[in-house]
Amino acid sequence: MADAKSTIAKDVTELIGNTPLVYLNRVVDGCVARVAAKLEMMEPCSSVKDRIGYSMISDAENKGLITPGESVLIEPTSGNTGIGLAFIAAAKGYRLIICMPASMSLERRTILRAFGAELVLTDPARGMKGAVQKAEEIKAKTPNSYILQQFENPANPKIHYETTGPEIWRGSGGKIDALVSGIGTGGTVTGAGKYLKEQNPNIKLYGVEPVESAILSGGKPGPHKIQGIGAGFIPGVLDVNLLDEVIQVSSEESIETAKLLALKEGLLVGISSGAAAAAAIRIAKRPENAGKLIVAVFPSFGERYLSTVLFESVKRETENMVFEP
């Protein structure tokens, strides 16, 4: 009897991508369009940023810019890109220094340290700009160091053009009418959006940003609670000309929607997934979208947010529980 072909991955990097799509069923009352979620929480390290962690490191290696065991990698991040880099740095043997605003969840810090990354916290009042500046300072005094620069690095949207976009197109059987994606670096909406519009120019692209920091809508940067989107500046990798519309969602609505996704859909997701879902539901209620298919990208898994406002009430409740005799 012939041996069955082995499907064992050679290492953890081969597990990235090919995440599933699932319809939302119980949070879509009043919607005239169908809403499906692209579950990036099913990546090996539970976020969409696993894709760019891999693509940015591979790209720099292929260009001869970094070498495992020799180069020191540095990156400013709101957390998930740091984790996406950290598990690959661990698998390949890189030293990694992460600069992150102190306002990001405790889970992020713990996971980064578990992968052996060094962590430098920056002033939360200065947002991502403060983390970027700190990374530059560290690079200046660290020999053989390299900043991957997710906000400027073309390898970021490129991986979404090559993988995320085609996966959504195939997964929807070419039936997608609109893509909804929160904008952090803008890599997902730019790369996947460009691919999808090449397949069908009528596909609409919706970016999502916090109402409290609505830069893309001409507003001012400000503090908000939607970790991972709304960096407070327009990233270099974002192609704003691709966007058909930018939807603003408040931190409160994002948090409430994320809670509902757990309670009604069985999907434990992060706050930015709540923002994407809230925007997608809003779009799906517009009469002109009757019968259409809207795909929302859910960037990360809820377990990474247990220490945040998202789970504050249930956490308090569980901490105060006593056993029954």
Curated annotation (Swiss-Prot):
Binding site for pyridoxal 5'-phosphate: N80, G184, T185, G186, G187, T188, S272
Pfam families, A to Z: PALP
InterPro entries recorded: Cys_synth, Cys_Synth/Cystath_Beta-Synth, CysK, P-phosphate_BS, TrpB-like_PALP, TrpB-like_PALP_sf
GO molecular function, one term: L-mimosine synthase activity
Subcellular location: Cytoplasm
PROSITE patterns: CYS_SYNTHASE (PS00901)
GO BP of this protein: cysteine biosynthetic process from serine
Principal localisation: cytoplasm
Cofactor(s) demanded: pyridoxal 5'-phosphate
Reaction it catalyzes: O-acetyl-L-serine + hydrogen sulfide = L-cysteine + acetate; pyrazole + O-acetyl-L-serine = 3-(pyrazol-1-yl)-L-alanine + acetate + H(+); pyrazole + L-serine = 3-(pyrazol-1-yl)-L-alanine + H2O; 3,4-dihydroxypyridine + O-acetyl-L-serine = 3-(3,4-dihydroxypyridin-1-yl)-L-alanine + acetate + H(+)
Pathway(s) this gene product operates in, as recorded in its UniProt entry: Amino-acid biosynthesis; L-cysteine biosynthesis; L-cysteine from L-serine: step 2/2
Key words of the record: Amino-acid biosynthesis, Cysteine biosynthesis, Cytoplasm, Lyase, Pyridoxal phosphate, Transferase
Record-listed N6-(pyridoxal phosphate)lysine modification sites: K49
Gene Ontology terms: cellular component: cytoplasm
SUPFAM superfamilies: Tryptophan synthase beta subunit-like PLP-dependent enzymes
UniProt-listed Enzyme Commission number(s): 2.5.1.47, 2.5.1.51, 4.2.1.50, 2.5.1.52
Subunit comment: Homodimer.
Annotated family: Belongs to the cysteine synthase/cystathionine beta-synthase family.
Annotated function: Produces L-cysteine from O-acetyl-L-serine and hydrogen sulfide. Can also use pyrazole and 3,4-dihydroxypyridine instead of the hydrogen sulfide to produce two plant specific non-protein amino acids beta-pyrazolylalanine and L-mimosine.
Xref: NCBIfam families: cysK (TIGR01139), cysKM (TIGR01136)
UniProt name for this protein: Cysteine synthase
Source lineage: Eukaryota, Viridiplantae, Streptophyta, Embryophyta, Tracheophyta
